[in-house]
């Protein structure tokens, strides 16, 4: 979910990593050698994979506060790889704009893993900026990836990406001060004027407003996008919308400045735990579904270690620790069974393990490309900056 970590914080997980290192190390030994080439646009980068087991240094770029404390040191202990874990992604667009000049030259700024939203991964695949995964190096991904995430339209064989976490965008309310907010349309009710926050994410906020208008985001035309933006603009200009936020809406809910917000499922889990008055509500129109994916950029200096990392975090025991900390939807099968024993409350939470019936009216992030994308982003940015 793009931009989801800006300005916010996460509760620290309470369970330390418990991993059977022998199993992990055996799987890591499958990392492959050889070479592959990646072409796209005007870029052609030759990638040479390290031979044998992973070693050396691995540089990872991820969003802030998106991993528990134990996973990185456990990976280092299991593999001997030295990890430089950078929490330097605060916006998909900002990070891409920073990296694009390097990627166009077949360089990655020393990084071997990025974690980016589906739409950005799709863009980078088309540009030829990503390496294809060697499936023999990531057997746990093949074995344990949730069925619902195995064949996204932008990467149907998961040749270039492995989900890091998934989640939902919907409504978080103060159930005492906004008891009757159940839909996106309810956020436009004048009784809540000046008490509503909207996300500053065009690919989540605008499609949700489309759903309020009865439009299927997956079939939306440019006119549908513009009509929804116009509705948001009117609400912003009238003062109905208090402000547009990243996940700093958490502070607004906590201090009472907002009574209802468009927000993310993982934040809702954490907010509810700290304040029982706050509650996630699945919009009657349905939510937006998203994932953020691990990818290996062209020019990655250590793709073997990158694949070893992907394989490691797809061990259910490892992923269970991550899930306990971040509280988003885990992409790994087998995690629920582990948490049923050590954290039953999380295991039964629909926001972490949503059923098909729970998300039946939800929609994936719709595509935006080319001239249409430029027009939509320009129009939405004008509202944000208005």
What are the roles of these predicted feature ranges?
Residues 1-57, 386:
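Short, low-complexity disordered leader/linker segments with a strong preference
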Residues 34, 43-123, 251:
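Early extracytoplasmic/lumenal segment of secretory-pathway proteins
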Residues 49-51, 104-116, 131-136, 140-170, ...:
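A structural signal for short loop-to-beta-strand junctions that line the ligand-binding cleft
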Residues 118-131, 146-149, 155-182, 205-213, ...:
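Periplasmic solute-binding protein
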Residues 121, 197-201, 205, 209, ...:
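Ligand-binding pocket segment of bilobal, Venus flytrap-like solute-binding proteins
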Residues 263, 272-325, 386:
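Extracytoplasmic/periplasmic substrate-recognition and gating elements
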Residues 297-360:
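Mature extracytoplasmic/periplasmic domains
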Residues 356-386:
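Conserved C-terminal helix/tail region of periplasmic/extracytoplasmic solute-binding proteins
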């Amino acid at each position: 979910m793009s931009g989801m970590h800006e300005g916010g914080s996460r509760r620290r997980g309470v369970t330390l990593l418990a991993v059977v290192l022998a199993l992990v190390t055996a799987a890591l030994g499958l990392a492959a050698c050889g070479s592959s080439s990646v072409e796209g646009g005007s870029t052609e980068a030759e990638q040479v994979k390290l031979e044998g087991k992973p070693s050396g240094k691995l540089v990872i770029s991820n969003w802030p506060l998106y991993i528990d404390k134990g996973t990185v040191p456990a990976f280092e202990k299991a593999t001997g790889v030295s990890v430089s874990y950078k929490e330097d992604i605060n916006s998909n667009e900002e990070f891409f704009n920073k990296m694009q000049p390097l990627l166009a030259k077949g360089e990655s700024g020393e990084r071997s893993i990025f974690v980016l939203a589906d739409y950005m991964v799709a863009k980078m695949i088309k540009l030829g900026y990503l390496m294809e995964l060697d499936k023999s190096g990531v057997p746990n991904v093949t074995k344990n990836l949730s069925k619902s995430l195995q064949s996204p339209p932008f990467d149907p064989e998961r040749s270039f990406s492995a989900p890091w976490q998934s989640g939902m965008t919907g409504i978080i309310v103060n159930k005492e001060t906004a008891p009757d907010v159940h839909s996106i349309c309810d956020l436009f009710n004048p009784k809540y004027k000046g008490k509503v926050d909207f996300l500053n994410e065009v690919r989540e906020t605008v499609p949700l407003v489309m759903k309020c208008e009865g439009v299927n985001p997956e079939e939306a035309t440019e006119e549908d996008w513009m009509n929804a933006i116009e509705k948001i603009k009117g609400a912003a200009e009238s003062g109905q919308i208090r402000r547009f936020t990243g996940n700093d809406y958490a502070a607004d809910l906590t201090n009472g400045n907002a009574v209802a917000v468009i927000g993310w499922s993982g934040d809702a889990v954490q907010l509810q735990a700290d304040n029982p008055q706050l509650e996630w509500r699945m919009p009657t129109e349905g939510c937006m579904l998203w994932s953020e994916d691990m990818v290996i950029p062209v020019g990655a200096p250590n793709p073997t270690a990158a694949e070893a990392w992907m394989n490691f975090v797809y061990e259910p025991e490892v992923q269970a620790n991550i899930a306990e900390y971040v509280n988003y939807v885990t992409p790994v099968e087998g995690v629920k069974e582990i948490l049923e024993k050590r954290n039953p409350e999380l295991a039964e939470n629909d926001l972490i393990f949503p059923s098909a019936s729970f998300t039946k009216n939800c929609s994936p992030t719709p595509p935006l490309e080319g001239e249409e994308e430029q027009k939509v982003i320009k129009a939405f940015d004008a509202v944000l900056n208005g």
